[in-house]
Amino acid sequence: MKGLLSVAALSLAVSEVSAHYIFQQLSTGSTKHGVFQYIRQNTNYNSPVTDLSSNDLRCNEGGASGANTQTVTVRAGDSFTFHLDTPVYHQGPVSVYLSKAPGSASSYDGSGTWFKIKDWGPTFPGGQWTLAGSYTAQLPSCITDGEYLLRIQSLGIHNPYPAGTPQFYISCAQIKVTGGGSVNPSGVAIPGAFKATDPGYTANIYSNFNSYTVPGPSVFSCGSNGGGSSPVEPQPQPTTTLVTSTRAPVATQPAGCAVAKWGQCGGNGWTGCTTCAAGSTCNTQNAYYHQCV
């Protein structure tokens, strides 16, 4: 009996950890660094932040300080890659932000301003999202030297507002920029950059989804002044075949499986586990997505 209970407890723990995803590793140059070596470790496992007024929107729950996190040196203009524990599977945009620390990145809480340097939005026609296990972007070459928080977020809008609540999956890396220029981009405060009335926050990806505006400011580039986010409009149909990837159907789970809180437990086409772990229930958010809450 004790053995069976241990197996059940382990199964539930694995389910909890795999319910969502987290950006946990950074690559710079040709080196893939250790898990949470240069990324602040959060305290909510891989669960999302949903409160638009929370300071946790900056660097996730438990990410206000980086005292136990190292800071990596990178050159302005160089590329970097964020890696996840499991590929992003909630539809929605992925964005990267920078915020310059007044001193060391490790002691900075992100209360200054943030500017966006990259968006991965949907492509049209079809509304296909970039659902990947890693995301590579480039630092602007013109920004000033110093220490920064490098923030990545995946905004899950798979559970349309207002029946559901969009989910922010966030991580912050600590970097020291060298070889830069003289530009200090203007930015936005977080929280405050995202509002419940933003079209990209309230979008319903299951109904008349033909264009999309990524929440937050526009992407900064050297020589630009920034501004509001630009909408992603439908593009002419390509003459070549566009190969896209979708999440593979989830295999039917064995009897006794349990979905962790915030995980998917049903919906049209869902073939996975439909039983929620103790303490949560399966709630119908829409025809396509049922969630343990």
From Swiss-Prot:
Family: Belongs to the polysaccharide monooxygenase AA9 family.
Use case: Lignocellulose is the most abundant polymeric composite on Earth and is a recalcitrant but promising renewable substrate for industrial biotechnology applications. Together with cellobiose dehydrogenases (CDHs) an enzymatic system capable of oxidative cellulose cleavage is formed, which increases the efficiency of cellulases and put LPMOs at focus of biofuel research. Glucose dehydrogenase and aryl-alcohol quinone oxidoreductases are also catalytically efficient electron donors for LPMO9E and can replace CDHs.
Matching PANTHER family: GLYCOSYLHYDROLASE FAMILY 61-7 PROTEIN, PUTATIVE (AFU_ORTHOLOGUE AFUA_1G12560)-RELATED
Gene: LPMO9E
GO cellular component: extracellular region
Cofactor binding: number and manner: Binds 1 copper ion per subunit.
Covalent S-S links between cysteines: C59-C172
Binding site for O2: H158, Q167
Keywords attached to this entry: Carbohydrate metabolism, Cellulose degradation, Copper, Disulfide bond, Metal-binding, Monooxygenase, Oxidoreductase, Polysaccharide degradation, Secreted, Signal
CDD domains with a match to the protein in the record: LPMO_AA9
Compartments (UniProt record): Secreted
Protein name: AA9 family lytic polysaccharide monooxygenase E
Regulation: Glucose dehydrogenase and aryl-alcohol quinone oxidoreductases regulate the oxidative degradation of cellulose since they can act as catalytically efficient electron donors for LPMO9E.
Cofactor(s) required for function per UniProt: Cu(2+)
Organism: Podospora anserina (strain S / ATCC MYA-4624 / DSM 980 / FGSC 10383) (Pleurage anserina)
Top-level EC class: oxidoreductase
Organism ancestry: Eukaryota, Fungi, Dikarya, Ascomycota, Pezizomycotina
Catalytic activity: [(1->4)-beta-D-glucosyl]n+m + reduced acceptor + O2 = 4-dehydro-beta-D-glucosyl-[(1->4)-beta-D-glucosyl]n-1 + [(1->4)-beta-D-glucosyl]m + acceptor + H2O
EC number, UniProt record: 1.14.99.56
